[in-house]
Design a protein with these regions (language model features):
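Polyanion-engaging groove/track-forming segments
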Residues: 1-721
Length: 721
């Protein structure tokens, strides 16, 4: 068997090549072909593309069947025999690591970590530092997992006693790793990896005879070794999107991993965008195995259009800068870069640009348009307000008639119960300000529980303002903050509201220490009762989320607190199921250590880590205008590709270097760098646009109006144009 590499500038050409390969069925009619894809969006598009090639008759009405799509993580888990419960995953590793750290804080080698966690501090300082306990442990677990995946030789050297490469401030990590391996009592990742590679080379993986990896631009060192081993007994095809065959040829003799500071591969690249944006692809090329059966460049049938975008793509393809003999036509709008005054204005500009394109070209449909945002959670409400409100605003802006699908959002943003859970944990560790309580009351499950309408919430907000409610449930709740009076608390304000309802306008002014609130009519009796019940139930919920207890007790108390203040209808029962499923998954990952003692900041950090980056179901390629982050649809060709929010402070991601990351001290080629990853995403987007590329960014300060520079990659794109 062998390893085959197929390259093309566009993924549709790669998909057609893959379709031609899969059109020849395997010998076993019941066997499935295995295709590994980097993201759900690529999977959805690829399956639709293949359906026009596989199983069709005389037309394009085929079906993509007999093909199993997998993620790299699931394939590696199957090969390594870990399934979905890898004990060395960061989430699972955190719990035994927490146990090791707790037991080692008094030892001399752990002094650095002990000081950071306040083990030797006193009073308030000790409590504040101890609140970092879970968050720090989870971060260290992530570092250890990164070492094992990207540079497995490092933890292997630590177990062998070789720590020569480490500086003194990181000397605690090898000892902590050795203690963790002792507690785990199973093969550490590097030994498991070596055994798996040896077994694959000897016996094979029990996988289909033909495998394909489609659309990847970066592979860790361990995955490259596994794939090389798989190729010993299987036909392994790598389908790589690469913008320039000439650039690939220029780097063909570079092989092996080197220190990133010694990598001068960019000097062999002529086109500036290939040099500055394409580091991930260059490093992937040099990390691939040297023993390749075929290295094929697929050219496709189409040429680049005679537009500014076409010229840019043509120059990138040729790895050359060729401005001679070109004259930009006045009507050429194939590349649009808009400097706007705010995120809201960016979405307004996007709306007008897309409407103009749809009006000018009747063949253009919403499904031909892709909108990508580095920070989709910031832009999702703005996009929802500017698009797709046709059912609400019948005679509004024409853009409201467009069908828009927001994909790849986090669970917290799509499941209101999970959002309530996050808000309750924040309230439990805060002063319980009026704004926080009112924001929680706006949540749909809370509104359903207490019957709050929009008018009710307006009245409640007015009462809170007029009663001068600021923070704190009552005097007792304020005591830990050094404030011992009841004024401006929720108890004080509610007493004023209740007195205002109960007494007539001509009643005496003060009743003890309570001044009845004016303009609260007798018709508001029911609403004041519901408001009082809400605040009292919230107080009980918040009071239940205190102290130090086991993980199981914490999640049980949080679930009960959510039930106390929320209600969902039958149509939204999935929210409860999803909440229970996420909590059960946390418990399963903790395993036998689910009774580990945790504080409120620990449980808050745990759930935030667990839910962060866990996207919802794949709402891609549904026939609507798709809006998503920049990862899931990378390299997928669309007639119009829009990049919104490429601000200097957001893109590329400002990755603050972790001072405890041993890899960051001397980074090697092939290791993940988020800024290089974002730059590669921009290069992929340029190649994915077949007719129009639209980029927007904030070009003015929100407060002063002073000009702001574009993000550096956008400035480089402008220079190239």
């Amino acid at each position: 068997m062998a390893l085959h590499i197929h390259r093309a500038e566009r993924t549709d050409v790669l998909a057609d090549g893959l379709g031609a390969l899969l059109a020849t069925p395997p010998a076993d009619p019941f066997a499935q072909d295995l295709v590994v894809v980097p993201a759900r969006g690529v999977e959805r598009w690829l399956s639709q593309r293949l359906s026009h090639i596989l199983g069709r008759g005389t037309g394009s009405d085929g079906i993509c069947a007999g093909v199993s799509f997998r993620s790299p993580a699931s394939l590696i888990a199957e090969i390594a025999g870990t399934g979905q419960d890898d004990p060395w995953s960061p989430e699972a590793m955190t719990w035994p690591l927490l146990e090791v750290i707790d037991a080692s804080l008094d030892e001399p080698w752990c002094r650095t970590l002990a000081d950071h966690l306040g083990h030797f501090a006193d009073g308030e300082e000790r409590e504040l530092r101890a609140a970092r306990r879970y968050a720090v442990t989870r971060r260290i677990a992530g570092l250890f997992a990164s070492y094992a995946r990207q540079r497995p030789g490092l933890p292997a050297d630590w177990l062998a006693g070789d720590t020569a490469e480490l500086t003194a401030d990181l000397a605690w990590q090898p000892q902590l790793w050795r203690r963790l391996v002792e507690v785990m009592a199973i093969d550490p990742p590097h030994i498991r990896h070596a055994k798996t590679v040896a077994l694959l080379r000897e016996l094979g993986a029990g996988l289909p005879a033909r495998l394909s990896l489609f659309g990847h631009t970066r592979l860790p060192a361990t995955e490259v070794e596994l794939l090389d081993a798989v190729a010993a007994h299987h036909e392994l095809h790598l389908w790589l999107p690469h913008p320039s065959a000439q650039a690939w040829a220029a780097l063909a003799d570079l092989r092996g991993v080197v220190a990133r500071r010694d990598d001068d591969s960019h000097r062999r690249i002529t086109h500036p965008l290939l040099a500055t944006l394409g580091r991930d692809l260059r490093e992937l090329q040099r990390s691939l195995p040297a023993s390749v059966e075929t290295d094929e460049a697929l050219t496709g049938s189409g040429s680049h259009p005679d537009t500014l975008l076409g010229w840019l793509q043509s120059d990138i393809s040729a790895n050359a800068v060729r401005p001679q003999g070109r004259s930009l036509r006045t009507e050429d709008r194939s590349v649009q870069i808009h400097s706007c005054h705010s995120p809201a204005r960016q979405v307004d500009v996007l709306r007008e640009v897309l409407l103009g394109l749809l009006v000018d070209d009747e063949t253009l449909e919403p499904r031909d348009i892709l909108v990508m945002c580095p920070d989709i959670e910031r832009y999702a409400p703005l996009i929802a307000a500017d698009f797709g409100l046709g059912d609400v605003v019948s005679d509004g802006h024409p853009a409201h008639r467009l069908r828009v699908r927001l994909a790849d959002r986090s669970l917290v943003q799509t499941n209101p119960l999970l959002q309530v859970a996050a808000q309750l944990l924040s309230l439990a560790g805060s002063r319980v300000t009026a704004t926080e309580v009112l924001n929680l009351a706006q949540s749909a499950p809370v509104r359903d529980r207490f019957g709050f309408t929009d008018d009710d919430l307006e009245d409640i907000t007015r009462w809170v303002r007029e009663a001068n409610i600021r923070w704190g449930f009552d005097q007792e709740h304020r005591t830990p903050y050094g404030v011992d009076f009841v004024h401006n608390t929720w108890r004080f304000g509610l007493d004023r509201v209740l007195a205002g309802v109960a007494l007539s306008d001509d009643s005496p002014g003060w009743i003890g220490n309570t001044l009845p609130l004016d303009d609260v009519g007798s018709n508001s009796v029911e609403l004041t009762g519901r408001l009082t019940e809400y605040v009292e139930r919230l107080r009980r919920a918040v009071d239940s989320l205190t102290g130090t207890r086991g993980l199981r007790d914490w999640l049980g108390s949080l679930a009960e607190a959510i039930r106390l203040i929320t209600r969902v209808g039958d149509a939204d029962a999935w929210q409860i199921s999803q909440l229970e499923r996420e909590f059960n998954e946390v418990l399963e990952r903790a395993g036998s250590r689910r009774d580990t003692m945790l504080r409120l900041p620990d449980i808050h950090s745990l759930l935030r880590q667990h839910l962060a980056g866990r996207p919802t179901r794949a709402n891609f390629r549904t026939g609507t205008l798709t809006v998503c982050t920049m990862v899931p649809m990378r390299s997928v060709p669309h007639r119009v590709v829009c990049l919104v929010g490429l601000d200097d402070t957001v893109f590329p991601r400002i990755g603050v270097a972790d001072g405890d990351d041993a890899l960051a001290r001397e980074s090697m080629t092939g290791e993940r760098d988020v800024r290089s990853e974002d730059r590669q995403l921009l290069l992929d987007a340029i190649g994915a646009a077949t007719e129009t590329l639209v980029v927007t960014y904030t070009g003015a300060n929100d407060y002063t109006g002073q000009p702001c520079p574009p993000a550096v990659p956008v400035a480089e794109l402008l220079d190239a144009l």
